[in-house]
A protein has these predicted regions:
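Non-globular, low-confidence helical/coil segments that flank catalytic cores
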Residues: 1-168
């Protein structure tokens, strides 16, 4: 599973890293949200490596981006006929070998900011858990806390790169 692929100029770096791991395909790619610093390299990756399915969080019509970056990603998804799915809280993705990803957020579709469409997910593998927060900001983090989602983890990414608008 690939979660995000960096800025527009990072696709080749992501491919180089995946090559060092010996990966020839990606079963699942999660695009946490459609800002270029998260999906910019995804089109390059999908052009070069088979991807089984791409996930985005729900994006309300009123804030669907019209950026070239987002359109490039959608174009490659269509060109390569890659299934595109919208995540829902509670959804699980079985990665095999005991690794399971659980989608935790966003917990509402009443969203006015693309950062808050960020997919939040928890990866459990054996006794270890990882929490990936995307760029959710404080109000959405508070809703996630109130939802009762299992946020207990051993390691986590800080929301919105650790900025003051997140990681409440």
């Amino acid at each position: 599973m690939l979660i995000d692929a960096g800025e527009n100029n990072m696709g080749d770096d992501v491919l180089t890293f995946l090559d060092t791991l010996g990966l020839e395909k990606i079963d699942y790619a999660i695009a946490t949200h459609p800002h270029s610093d998260h999906i910019g390299g995804l089109d390059t990756v999908m052009q070069e490596i088979p991807v089984g399915e791409v996930f985005f969080g729900p994006i309300p019509d009123k804030i669907v981006p019209t950026t070239k970056t987002f359109e490039d990603v959608l174009d490659v998804i269509e060109e390569k006929d890659i299934p595109l799915s919208t995540t829902t809280p509670g959804q699980t993705i079985d990665l095999g070998s005991g690794a399971v990803v659980t989608i935790l957020g966003p917990v509402t579709e009443d969203i006015d900011d693309l950062n808050n469409t960020s997919v939040v997910c928890r990866l459990d593998f054996g006794e270890t858990s990882f929490l990936f927060n995307g760029d959710q900001e404080t109000p959405m983090e508070e809703l996630l806390l109130q939802s009762g989602a299992n946020l207990d983890c051993d390691m986590m990414t800080m929301g919105h790169h650790g900025s003051s608008t997140s990681s409440s």
